[in-house]
């Protein structure tokens, strides 16, 4: 789309955590438009559907059909992806266009801007300048702090466990190409296949008050994890036993921003709309942001500040709804009614009735980054 971009990454190497993510049709639509959809699909898994299951009985409700149904309904697949594979595909795409366009070991410390340029100061004492600065620097965004001041992250009261399970470690009947949300009082478990069914991604979320480490790399033990989900269905226990090394982290929230941009600087992704991972839209929203921003920079006439304002206007309400929808799912997945067998059945049947599911997901999946008005 005609933008000459330099990427400054503080990590010394491009290495993603070993975890999965879900890319619904609104995300894969952008990746196909960028020409990397098929490359990623070849490394991923196209689940046939998603299910809701009760935490202790395993009783099941359909969440929605995927696979060919997603392609037929939305024009693009719903992929479950190993995060390092997505990073590799995107990195190769950038380097095909600009071999030296990614600068590793380059941590941004501060920036200044004037009417003509913006200058980024790096931790090695050097600085670089350009027409615009895009802060895609995550939940601890330096760019956000400089633009809008410090804001303290708040603990949501939820910890999450993650792990990657080799599919061969699971009983054969569990090696299914579906995604499952196990819902229970005060917690839930999500799992889905990765890498053409060779791996299973596991995430378990639990309401707790005694763990506030935000790092993704805090190791736990399978014994701790099993204790946290004691009494849950045997299939959940089987997955926990099969995880080689589980990790845990605290889910933190930051106040939403009423605006993202100032003159030549703007934000993207978690830097401006971090969300709890209960709508499977965090990565997708960042992909959408990037595509819409590129369109704004190349399609909108006028000064740069106007281009960034139009990008922000196109994205603010949608990302706000995604943040709120993710938070709403905490109560939906963890509802106290799920503790009682009879109430749980009625509750799940009502909450995941077809019209309710459609109201929560159709507006997400049908969004088209190539056509949205900017």
Predicted feature locations:
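Active-site substrate-recognition segment that forms the wall
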Residues: 177-212, 218, 222-231, 251
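C-terminal auxiliary extensions adjacent to catalytic cores
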Residues: 348-374
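Conserved mid-domain beta->alpha element of the FAD-binding
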Residues: 1-12, 134-135, 161, 191, ...
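A structural signal for isolated positions on well-ordered beta-strands in alpha/beta enzyme cores
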Residues: 6, 101, 201-203
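Conserved N-terminal helical subregion
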Residues: 24-166, 209-226, 364-374
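A short coil-to-beta-strand element that immediately follows conserved catalytic motifs
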Residues: 104, 155-157, 174-178, 199, ...
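Acidic/histidine metal-binding catalytic segments
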Residues: 42-45, 230-245, 304-309, 322
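A generic "structured core" feature
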Residues: 1, 9-10, 19, 98, ...
């Amino acid at each position: 789309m005609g933008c000459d971009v330099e990427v400054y990454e503080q990590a010394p190497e491009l290495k993603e955590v070993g975890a999965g993510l879900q890319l619904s049709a609104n995300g894969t639509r952008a990746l196909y438009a960028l020409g990397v959809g098929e490359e990623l699909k070849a490394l991923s898994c196209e689940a046939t559907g998603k299910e809701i299951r009760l935490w202790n009985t395993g009783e099941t409700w359909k969440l929605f059909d995927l696979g060919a149904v997603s392609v037929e309904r939305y024009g693009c697949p719903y992929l479950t992806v190993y995060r390092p594979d997505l990073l590799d595909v995107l990195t190769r795409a950038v380097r095909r266009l600009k071999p030296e366009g990614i600068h590793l070991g380059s941590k941004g410390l501060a920036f200044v801007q004037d009417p003509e340029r913006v200058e980024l100061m790096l931790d090695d004492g050097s600085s670089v300048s350009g027409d615009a600065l895009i802060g895609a620097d995550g939940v601890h965004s330096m760019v956000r702090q400089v633009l809008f001041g410090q804001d303290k992250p708040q603990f949501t009261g939820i910890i999450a466990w993650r792990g990657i399970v080799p599919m061969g470690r699971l009983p054969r009947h569990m090696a299914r190409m579906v995604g499952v949300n196990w819902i229970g009082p005060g917690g839930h478990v999500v799992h889905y296949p990765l890498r053409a069914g060779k791996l299973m991604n596991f995430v378990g979320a639990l309401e707790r008050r005694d763990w506030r480490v935000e790092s993704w790399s805090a190791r736990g033990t399978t014994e701790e994890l099993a204790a946290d989900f004691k009494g849950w269905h045997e299939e959940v226990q089987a997955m926990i036993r099969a995880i080689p090394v589980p990790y845990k982290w605290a889910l933190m929230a930051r106040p939403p921003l009423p605006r993202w941009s100032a003159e030549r600087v703007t934000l993207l992704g978690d830097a401006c709309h971090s969300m709890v991972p209960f709508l499977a839209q965090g990565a997708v929203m960042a992909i959408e942001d990037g595509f819409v921003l590129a369109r704004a920079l190349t399609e909108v006439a006028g000064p740069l500040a106007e281009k960034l304002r139009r990008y922000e206007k196109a994205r603010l309400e949608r990302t706000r709804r995604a943040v709120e929808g993710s938070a709403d799912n905490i109560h939906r997945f963890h509802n106290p009614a799920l503790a009682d067998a009879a109430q749980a059945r009625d509750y799940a049947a009502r909450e995941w009735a077809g019209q309710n599911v459609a109201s929560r997901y159709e507006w997400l999946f049908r969004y088209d980054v190539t056509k949205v008005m900017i």
